[in-house]
């Protein structure tokens, strides 16, 4: 299992075009590119990123846009809203294709405490299918990420979506968001593990007085060995990315200490005989 970094972990610490050379300088073989805003979808900007990625010898596995900028409107009942959102979606897919990404990480519709209408699974499952087909035209697999405030916040939702879409939709497992939703990440693996193709890592420690402290991967108490072993049982063969909020660490070297600790954890799991 390769352990990489998401450029999202550099948010407000370093711009994406500067984060890429930094990742390469540390010998990290693979990354997830987080595109922050519309200007970063522009072909000239994407081309500059592609050149820097090539110079740094970094593989891009996945692309992840700032979801709330357009993804909820992909599921809108208003045709113009949806058409404009699809145009933006396809701009990101085009960017992902140029960067060599294999996967698109999607949040999908927000729940917003039940205040959003028209997100019944029977209505949106065909939309997911359409979006997956559009992504495939760019050579990219659509993956729906579990997110505490979006439609896929409970493991059962993923299982129901799979039943309705015949396995066409794959998933990104996000450890932090699983815990925020009140679940163990392994609950999602049990529900949709055969369809997980991407993993976001963050650590979590249960506090004696209740609540959770989120940590850099390898700095907390989450049982990653068991999680990796369960992924292995489900046939997972992809990478995993350190994807944390940038206010969780003070200095960039902490990212690489975290990466080193995660590689050590991986070596104690079923993936331990692989090179990474």
What are these regions (language model features)?
Residues 1-4, 13-27, 101, 154-173, ...:
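Histidine-acidic metal/acid-base catalytic patches
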Residues 1-97, 166, 170, 194, ...:
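N-terminal pre-domain/capping segments
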Residues 8-10, 34-38, 65-68, 109-111, ...:
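Active-site beta-loop-alpha junctions enriched in small/polar residues
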Residues 17, 55, 72-170:
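Active-site acidic/histidine proton-transfer and metal-coordination neighborhood
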Residues 29-30, 59, 102, 141, ...:
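Residue-level detector of anion-binding/catalytic polar loops
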Residues 45-56, 127-134, 226-230:
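Catalytic-core regions built around general acid/base machinery
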Residues 69-72, 113, 205-210:
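Short acidic/His/Gly/Ser-rich catalytic and metal-binding motifs that mark active-site loops
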């Amino acid at each position: 299992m390769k352990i990489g970094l998401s450029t999202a972990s550099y948010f407000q610490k370093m711009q994406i075009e500067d984060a890429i050379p930094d990742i390469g300088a540390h010998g990290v073989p693979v990354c997830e590119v987080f595109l922050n805003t519309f200007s970063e979808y522009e072909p000239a900007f994407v081309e500059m990123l592609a050149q820097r990625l090539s110079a740094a010898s970094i593989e891009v596995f996945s692309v992840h846009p700032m979801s709330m900028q357009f993804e909820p409107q992909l599921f809108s009942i208003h045709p113009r809203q949806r058409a404009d959102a699809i145009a933006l979606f396809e701009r990101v897919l085009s960017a992902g294709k140029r960067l060599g990404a294999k996967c698109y990480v999607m949040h999908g519709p927000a729940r917003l405490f039940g205040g959003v209408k028209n997100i019944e699974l029977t209505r949106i499952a065909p939309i997911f299918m359409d979006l997956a087909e559009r992504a495939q035209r760019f050579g990219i697999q659509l993956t729906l990420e579990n997110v505490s405030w979006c439609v896929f916040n409970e493991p059962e939702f993923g299982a129901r979506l799979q039943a309705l879409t015949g396995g066409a939709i794959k998933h990104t497992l996000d450890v932090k968001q699983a815990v925020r939703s009140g679940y163990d990440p392994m609950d999602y693996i049990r529900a949709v593990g055969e369809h997980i193709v991407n993993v976001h890592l963050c650590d979590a420690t249960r506090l004696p007085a209740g609540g959770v402290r989120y940590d850099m991967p390898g700095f907390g108490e989450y049982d990653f060995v068991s999680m990796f072993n369960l992924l292995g049982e489900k046939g997972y063969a992809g990478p995993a990315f350190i994807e944390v909020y940038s206010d969780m660490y003070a200095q960039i070297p902490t990212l690489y200490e975290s990466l080193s600790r995660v590689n050590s954890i991986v070596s104690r799991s079923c993936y331990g005989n692989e090179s990474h």
